[in-house]
């Protein structure tokens, strides 16, 4: 007579032998339904004889799974559930090594459940993670790890399993779902603050000699490709590679545009736009349409009404105030360095305004020669809204010269400086080649 345990083992054995993703996934999920979950939790611990029908590499998966079910349904312990599920996913990684990509969906589901259990544990018991991190910092031997690091190691194992699959047929390869593992792994590394590890993962991806799926491929891979592109763009942003960062985010936006209902991806879109909009302004002097501002009023207020407006009008006081006001948001989104560099656009607009005023007052042929003192006064008014002769300038002439030298060297102004005469000599043809806003 068959027992519930033997029936379950037979079901596992059949699903593995038939390479049935859906059935095997249902055999190792922590949520098979409350009744089935309770039944599995009360199975006796299987011995070697019980497990004999199951392919050898999958036996530890079943053993760790049944241990996990007891932690979930009997002990009701979120801590034990996390560690047991982490053990099961590691066993599944080992078992999946020799399988084709039929194993991807069960593995993806197991990893998704592991991440969810970690998130619940972290939300309900934040002191546990804080204590682990504290113990990790105080451990002189450095041989322990936090739950988040354990999670990272496990997902990294799944990523390597996918990346190193040597099957040349992509349709049968575990690489087909690589963006799920890549997107989640790089996100975890960011949470850990280990950006070098995130870079090493990206380097490994670029270094593979095997074909990879298209970023805008079908199915759920799109979602994780967007996650990967977003965090990869942040890495480029931190390296001050603004062009590459923009390209990655544009690709992410192209993928999101394929969704039938934009409302389903509005949050993702806004998260990308908060970085993409200043990149487009800095790289190409592009500003978004009114339609974008209407869809994202928070971005409109922060950018169009404040930071971008200050840049477009050369208003240094408004720019500095907005930079201070939104400092935390900019730091959180890796944008603070970019906006510090965008201050040069503010200077540029101010210099052009000054030159325009001088030209209107002096129509002589030498109006392209601008004294530094004129620009110094413009900087003072833009910074403090006023100037009295008794006041000290916010920018001395050396600082003004330095600002102009940077604008010239970066190609934003055509001309040269005369230190002896304390003036800038502008090109008569096109002194401000990069100031066209579109």
Swiss-Prot record:
Q: Which domain of life is it from?
A: Eukaryota
What residue stretches are annotated with the PCI domain? 226-431
Q: Which InterPro entries match?
A: Csn12-like, PCI_dom, WH-like_DNA-bd_sf
Q: Which SMART domains match?
A: PAM
Q: Identify a single GO molecular function assigned to this protein.
A: RNA binding
Instruction: List, alphabetically, the PROSITE patterns matched.
Output: PCI (PS50250)
Similarity comment? Belongs to the CSN12 family.
Q: What is this protein called?
A: Protein CSN12 homolog
Q: Which organism is it from?
A: Debaryomyces hansenii (strain ATCC 36239 / CBS 767 / BCRC 21394 / JCM 1990 / NBRC 0083 / IGC 2968) (Yeast)
Q: Which lineage is the organism of this entry classified under, starting from the top rank?
A: Eukaryota, Fungi, Dikarya, Ascomycota, Saccharomycotina
- Chain's gene name: CSN12
